[in-house]
Design a protein with these regions (language model features):
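Helix-loop-helix junctions that connect adjacent transmembrane segments
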Residues: 5-10, 47-48, 122-125, 157-290
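Membrane-interface "cap" regions at the ends of multi-pass membrane proteins
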Residues: 1-35, 40-46, 58-63, 75, ...
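C-terminal membrane-solvent junction of multi-pass transporters and transport-like membrane proteins
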Residues: 154, 324-332, 372-429, 455-458, ...
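Membrane-interface loop-to-helix entry segments
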Residues: 127-184, 215, 238-242, 364-377, ...
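TM-loop-TM module centered on a large, flexible mid-protein loop between adjacent transmembrane helices
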Residues: 80-81, 87, 119, 189, ...
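Extracellular loop-to-transmembrane helix junctions
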Residues: 11, 24, 34-129, 133, ...
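Membrane-helix boundary/coupling elements in multi-pass transport proteins
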Residues: 74, 97-111, 214-227, 283-323, ...
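Helix-loop-helix connectors at the membrane interface of multi-pass transporters/channels
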Residues: 1-7, 80-83, 89, 110-130, ...
Length: 466
C-alpha cells in the first residue's frame, strides 16, 4: 500500500494558545464535576490515592505517546503508531474502537447539556436543545480547525477559572479565614472511619471510576498535528501534564474531602463540588454548578466531534475506511468525517428509542473499557516503536523515562486492571462488551482486505507524516 501523509490535506490553523488550552481541557472533563462524588462515596478520603494512581498512569501514557508523536506527528495519533509498530490489524481495530467511543460521547454529553438548559427554560423540550447544541457545534467544526480551537480555548479557559476559584475558596475555608461558614482544618480526612474507611479494595474500585475521567488527554497529539510546529506543542503539553493533573484533580478533590464528610447523605445526587459550595453558603450554588457543568459538557461534545472526525479521516487516508471519509473542504476540514460522525451519534439515539433496552445498553457498555485498551495499545506501540526508530537511525527528541522498565510496568498494570474488571460484577459487562466489539472489528479485517485489496496484517513503514 502507498505511503500517505495523514495530515497533508488538513490545515495548520491551530495556534500555540489553542494547543496549550486544548492540553488543559483534555484533562478537565465533566466527569470531574459529575462523577467525582461517586468515587468519593466509594473510597472516602482515600479517593486521593485513586486519583493519584490514575493520574500517574496518564502521565506515563502521555509521555509514551509524546515520544512517538514528536518523532512522527500525525492526526491519527496512536492508531497510526499501532499500524507501524504492531501491525495494520492493531491500528485498524483501535482506530475504529476509539472513533466509536467518541461517537457515543456526543449524544450523551448533548443530553446532559440539554437537561440543564431545559431546567432553565422548561418550555423547550430536551430533544430540541440537544439537537440545536449538536448542530451548532457540528457547524463550527465544519468551518475550520481554527474555529474549533478558538471555541475550545474559551470553554477551557472558563473551566480553568472555575476550578482555580474553587481551589482558592476552599483553601481560604480550610485555613479558617472564611467568615461565612464555620469550617476549618482537615480533620474530615480521618473523622469518619479514618482515611481509608472501606479498605484498599475500595480505592481500587474508585480508581476504575476515576481512570476514565482522564480520557481525552491524548487529544492534544492529534490537534498538534494541525498546528505549525506540532513537535514543540506536544513537548510543552506533555511536560505540563503533571502539574495540570496535580492542580485540577488532586488539589480540587483534596478541598472536597477536607471540607465535607465522605459519607454525607445525598452526596451522589447533589454532587461533590456543589456540596462544598452549599456548605460555604455560596448563593445560587446549584445554578453556578449547572453553568460550570454545561460549559464542561459543551467542551467535551466539541472535542468529541473533533476527535471522532479526525480519527475517521485518518482511517480513510490509510485505506481502513471508505475514501469519501477523507475528503476535505476549502477550509481543509474533513467535512464528510464530521457529518458521518454526527450522523452515527444520532443513530445511537434512534436505537435508544426504537430498539430493545438491552441493545442500547450493550452499545454503551461496549465503550466501557476502550480507554484502557487505548492506553495498552499506546504502551505496546511505544515499546516497539523505540526499537524501530533506533534501527532506522531516527532521532528521538523526547524519551520515555526508564525505558523499557516503566513501559512494561504500565502494560502489566493495565492488564491487571482489565482482569480485575473482568471479575467485578459492576465492570464485568463493560469488559466483555468491549472485547466482543473489538473481536467483531478484527473479524472484518479479511473482508476489508479483499474489498480494498489491503494487507492489513502487515506493518507500515515508519515515516514522518508532517
Amino acid at each position: 500500500m502507498g505511503q500517505l501523509s495523514q495530515s497533508q490535506d488538513l490545515g495548520a490553523g491551530l495556534k500555540s494558545r489553542h494547543v496549550t488550552m486544548l492540553s488543559i481541557a483534555g484533562v478537565i472533563g465533566a466527569s470531574l464535576f459529575v462523577g467525582s462524588s461517586v468515587a468519593i462515596a466509594e473510597a472516602g478520603p482515600a479517593v486521593l490515592l485513586a486519583y493519584l494512581f490514575a493520574g500517574l498512569l496518564v502521565v506515563m501514557i502521555m509521555r509514551m505517546l509524546a515520544e512517538m508523536a514528536v518523532a512522527t506527528p500525525d492526526t491519527g495519533s496512536f492508531s497510526t503508531y499501532a499500524d507501524k509498530a504492531i501491525g495494520r490489524w492493531a491500528g485498524y481495530t483501535i482506530g475504529w474502537l476509539y472513533w466509536w467511543f467518541w461517537v457515543l460521547v456526543i449524544p450523551l454529553e448533548a443530553n446532559i447539556a440539554a437537561i440543564i438548559l431545559h431546567s432553565w427554560v422548561p418550555g423547550v423540550p430536551v430533544w430540541l436543545f440537544s439537537l440545536v447544541i449538536t448542530l451548532a457545534l457540528t457547524g463550527s467544526n465544519l468551518l475550520s480547525v481554527k474555529n474549533y480551537g478558538e471555541f475550545e480555548f474559551w470553554l477551557a479557559l472558563c473551566k480553568v477559572i472555575a476550578i482555580l476559584a474553587f481551589i482558592v475558596l476552599g483553601a481560604v475555608a480550610i485555613t479558617g479565614f472564611y467568615p461565612y461558614a464555620e469550617v476549618s482544618g482537615i480533620s474530615r480526612l480521618w473523622d469518619h472511619g479514618g482515611f481509608m474507611p472501606n479498605g484498599f479494595g475500595a480505592v481500587l474500585s474508585a480508581m476504575l471510576i476515576t481512570m476514565f475521567s482522564f480520557m481525552g488527554a491524548e487529544i492534544v497529539t492529534s490537534a498538534a498535528a494541525e498546528s505549525d510546529t506540532p513537535d514543540k506543542h506536544i513537548v510543552r503539553a506533555t511536560n505540563s501534564v503533571i502539574w495540570r493533573i496535580s492542580i485540577f484533580y488532586l488539589c480540587s478533590i483534596f478541598i472536597v474531602v477536607a471540607l465535607i464528610p465522605w459519607n454525607m447523605p445525598g452526596l451522589k445526587s447533589i454532587g461533590s463540588y456543589r456540596s462544598v459550595l452549599e456548605l460555604l453558603h455560596i448563593p445560587y450554588a446549584k445554578l453556578i454548578m449547572d453553568g460550570v457543568i454545561l460549559l464542561s459538557v459543551t467542551s467535551c461534545l466539541n472535542s468529541a466531534l473533533y476527535t471522532a472526525s479526525r480519527m475517521l479521516y485518518s482511517l480513510s487516508r490509510r485505506g481502513d475506511a471508505p475514501a469519501i471519509m477523507g475528503r476535505t473542504n476549502r477550509s481543509k476540514t474533513p467535512y464528510v468525517a464530521v457529518l458521518l460522525s454526527t450522523g452515527a451519534a444520532y443513530l445511537t439515539v434512534v436505537v435508544n428509542y426504537y430498539a430493545p433496552a438491552k441493545v442500547f445498553k450493550f452499545l454503551i457498555d461496549s465503550s466501557g473499557a476502550i480507554a484502557l485498551l487505548v492506553y495498552l495499545v499506546i504502551a505496546v506501540s511505544q515499546l516497539r516503536m523505540r526499537k524501530i526508530l533506533q534501527a532506522q537511525g531516527g532521532e528521538i527528541r523526547l524519551r520515555m523515562w526508564l525505558y523499557p522498565y516503566l513501559t512494561w510496568l504500565v502494560i502489566a498494570f493495565i492488564t491487571f486492571v482489565l482482569v480485575v474488571m473482568l471479575f467485578r460484577p459492576a465492570q464485568q459487562l463493560e469488559v466483555i462488551s468491549t472485547g466482543l466489539l473489538a473481536l467483531g472489528i478484527i473479524c472484518t479485517v479479511p473482508i476489508m482486505s479483499r474489498w480494498k485489496k489491503l494487507v492489513l496484517w502487515q506493518k507500515l513503514p515508519l515515516q514522518n507524516t508532517r
